[in-house]
Amino acid sequence: MALPMVGLLLLLLLGGPGAAITIPPEYGAHDFLQPPELTEEPPEQLVVFPSDDIVLKCVATGNPPVQYRWSREDQPFVPEEHGGVSVVPGSGTLVINATLAARLQGRFRCFATNALGTAVSPEANVIAENTPQWPKEKVTPVEVEEGDPVVLPCDPPESAVPPKIYWLNSDIVHIAQDERVSMGQDGNLYFSNAMVGDSHPDYICHAHFLGPRTIIQKEPLDLRVAPSNAVRSRRPRLLLPRDPQTTTIALRGGSVVLECIAEGLPTPWVRWRRLNGPLLPGGVGNFNKTLRLWGVTESDDGEYECVAENGRGTARGTHSVTVEAAPYWVRRPQSGVFGPGETARLDCEVGGKPRPQIQWSINGVPIEAAGAERRWLRGGALVLPELRPNDSAVLQCEARNRHGPLLANAFLHVVELPLRMLTADEQRYEVVENQTVFLHCRTFGAPAPNVEWLTPTLEPALQDDRSFVFTNGSLRVSAVRGGDGGVYTCMAQNAHSNGSLTALLEVRAPTRISAPPRSATAKKGETVTFHCGATFDPAVTPGELRWLRGGQPLPDDPRYSVAAEMTVSNVDYGDEGTIQCRASTPLDSAEAEAQLRVVGRPPSRDLQVMEVDEHRVRLSWTPGDDHNSPIEKFVVEEEEEREDLQRGFGAADVPGQPWTPPLPLSPYGRFPFRVVAVNAYGRGEHHAPSAPIETPPAAPERNPGGVHGEGNETGNLVITWEPLPPQAWNAPWARYRVQWRPLEEPGGGGPSGGFPWAESTVDAPPVVVGGLPPFSPFQIRVQAVNGAGKGPEATPGVGHSGEDLPLVYPENVGVELLNSSTVRVRWTLGGGPKELRGRLRGFRVLYWRLGWVGERSRRQAPPDPPQIPQSPAEDPPPFPPVALTVGGDARGALLGGLRPWSRYQLRVLVFNGRGDGPPSEPIAFETPEGVPGPPEELRVERLDDTALSVVERRTFKRSITGYVLRYQQVEPGSALPGGSVLRDPQCDLRGLNARSRYRLALPSTPRERPALQTVGSTKPEPPSPLWSRFGVGGRGGFHGAAVEFGAAQEDDVEFEVQFMNKSTDEPWRTSGRANSSLRRYRLEGLRPGTAYRVQFVGRNRSGENVAFWESEVQTNGTVVPQPGGGVCTKGWFIGFVSSVVLLLLILLILCFIKRSKGGKYSVKDKEDTQVDSEARPMKDETFGEYRSLESEAEKGSASGSGAGSGVGSPGRGPCAAGSEDSLAGYGGSGDVQFNEDGSFIGQYRGPGAGPGSSGPASPCAGPPLD
């Protein structure tokens, strides 16, 4: 197809003496003449049916306008001469009515003509067909036996366009196809072997004709398959192709289908192969029965074989494919515009098989008939020399072989045009020294103009060897100098006209790099910076400085930052290379470069096993990049893998060579290896481990360590050891052979090797051996064994059987008094090691206090003291002893913290790992008298309105003879100061004035310090200061009463509301709890018409319940009698209540009698009953630590004695009755009891009860002391 005339590109006529020209758009030739050029052509073949019109398109462009004409069967065809034939206005498209289609079918061609030539269209072959129909035929049933092949024919009507074939049944359901049943390319339905289930009366072949859009169907075929009792299998036989050797023609660029359909029983399977080369995949279809070749090329030429197999035999068919080609373009003739006198050459090179015949025509007339003046053919090309304006024409090149024609139109246009300067005048050019500059002078004219350049000195430019003028008029000046600047002149002319233009050349200084960057070496992960400076010609702006890496722009990476310098942070090996600094202007650029060298740790790869046996391996590997630092060594790491173990990699250093000497391997292991390269910058990264190397099991190479033998019970021996780790087993499992034998012969004859070894094989420790004499030495050893054998011979160790209680006790026990609270005890150990029956662990000193020096024997002992070791038929100690433990082989100890002026006894015993031995004989000693301490605390609490409780505590160092307590009422008009001599550190002062305050003082005896003073009061404390701000009122209802009260806004106090029936003797009952912030409370459950007393009860700081408001409330209504039969009227209930009241009355009487009764007490005895709790080892001795032998019984005694002795607690007796632990709650020790030994007997009465006092006189009270 020809190119448009305006804007046609300049094309070279290859091998020709001339070249076509293109009129530039800016030349302005708007009315330029154009030869005809076809834009729409009729198809090569057109098939029409009775209802279709024949439409043959033919449209062309040209100036002057184009005229159209047609030919039919190479004869002129005039549409106007045929009724029903017309031409579309404005084009050459031919329309033939459908009624004339059958009569006017044939070969048509279109011609488009104007003053410059004639363009010819390809031939269009018009075929008129009738509507396809199947001829009437008589269809007979197809009858076959089971297993026979069947072919159901289709035979559709013939057509220029083959139809698509479908096989369906009468329900319009497709016949299922598979390896046994399939449709061939001819439309027939093939059965490789018939089955009884194939019997159907309605096999219908449908043909779909795409042109007329019609589907027709064949008469149904009745297939009847008779069952057979003797179905025999048979070898395959080809149904298609019918000839075992078939030749197929395939056209280049098209597709071809090769087909093989076979019959046989069982159903054959088809496969394909190419005999003269490989078979490309993807072309097999239709259950392997077809092979399709797409986009056929000459390489597909050859033989293809199909093979049908079914186990009974083989059938083969060969397809010989010959590839041919319709004509196709190798070099197509091109249209062109030429000037007068030029030579034109039009090439027409066509390929095809068979080789096509080429025919040249001029304006649709064969060249032979058009005359040969100034035209000749050369190698298929048409050459036209010395062109003249009247040589303009349209030339046709048509190629043809048996597969069809190929036609191309190319016009030849000869024109004459005056000269026109296309480049603007006075253009300005800038260039840098030593560069090349191009000064343009574009011109156009036909014939082509001649161009000449003049320098600023008006000399021809071509006189300078540095200048060159191109055919398009441009001047090139190379290696420009500073003096080359100035105004240049271009002059052009052709046969019709001439013209000129000027160009200004300015020469600039080059751009230079003033401070080039320096190469750098950086370690991976560091930051590196490059600096660069440049100078620019001041007349050239702007100048730009850019950074590149390897000639490419810097990557889009935040690690690269560019400002006055370039910085690369966290450098990696990929950053290594050439760094360029480029300074550029619109005219030139300068560049300097530096090398970035990144160093780091080297990698290694491709680990391979060179040689391996049971106990060693040799490895090799490929060293990786050394990252600019030579590899110093390789570290070979080995890992052992087992099902029950996986330990980390162990390492071995290898010098620089990439292989290892033999490396040892442990038995029964899987050993992956990896290699790490090392250079001056450290170890490289690990590569993937190698495939594990497995070694067979072997006997253990070592025995377990930590073998120890020791008894944990008398007469046994427990042998333990540290089990081998799994990696030392050398096998899937390991056991232990444990052996033992006595170290000495019976009778102590010394070591002997005559004893046989006893042994036991176990999986894990321990091994326990029983029935042995106590603490006897044994030789023991443990050997590892596994399925491959025994470990090395084990070295025996020594162990001992279990210990027994010692039979020996300390002798020569003596006591040395050091001061009133410390003594030194010494002893020796009797007997020998055999009597010790174990390892000596230490000694225990057991001691206890008997009482004060000089007092009589105790009358009673603490209940159930804990048992201590003692000699037979010997009485136990009176108090639980205190134990001092001394570790090791000691021969003495210090006993400190003893009570002065006291009698003590002690015993010493030895102990081993099993326990304590028998104690020594008891040794008695006495401590000298000590110094009393001052009183430490005096506490006073109110008991009731006329009594106070007094508690005194001090640290005693000797026997106390008494206490002097002074007290005085502090209110105005009070009585004189009173006093009392106390024999007990706790007592009650009774008969005091009610609601009075007293000052009490307790001086020490002798008076080393001022007296200890305090203040007490018999006045009860109010519950809270807010009660004085209460305002209370009440009103009664029928079954309840509402009580309203007011208090300060910030008060939030809870209290109890109590009530009682005023007309009965019932006690106060609690209704509930109220809160001062609620301002009201409602009493519920009252009887109508009844008067009640109501009071509020709060708790003061001493914990007492105190009533702070009382009033009366009257409910409304009358009393309604309750119906009889209630529980309260039952006789059994009245009797039960009476019994409870009687028991409570008896208990109250007994308590009153006990509270009023006086008694005797002995301060001395109470002090004797205390166990000294301050005994502890002295810091200047090294005999060990104390261990108390007091049992839970002692704790229970202490807790029991304190249960009823708290101040103000229920059941508290008078001072004379004894209160053993009355100070225990105040932080004192248990030794706080005071009893007199008979020197003070009876009760002491005070100065007399006050006016408001009541109750019995205090037993603590005595004559007043002034």
Curated annotation (Swiss-Prot):
A motif (Cell attachment site) lies at residues 914-916. Residues 1199-1211 have a biased composition (Gly residues). Disulfide bonds join 58-110, 154-205, 260-306, 348-397, 441-490, 532-581. GO terms for biological process: axon guidance; dendrite self-avoidance; homophilic cell adhesion via plasma membrane adhesion molecules. Glycans are attached at residues 97, 288, 390, 434, 472, 498, 712, 819, 1061, 1075, 1100, 1116. Residues 21-1130 are extracellular. Residues 862-881 have a biased composition (Pro residues). The keyword Repeat applies. CDD domains: FN3, Ig4_L1-CAM_like, IgI_2_L1-CAM_like. Binds to itself and to axonin 1. This is Neuronal-glial cell adhesion molecule.
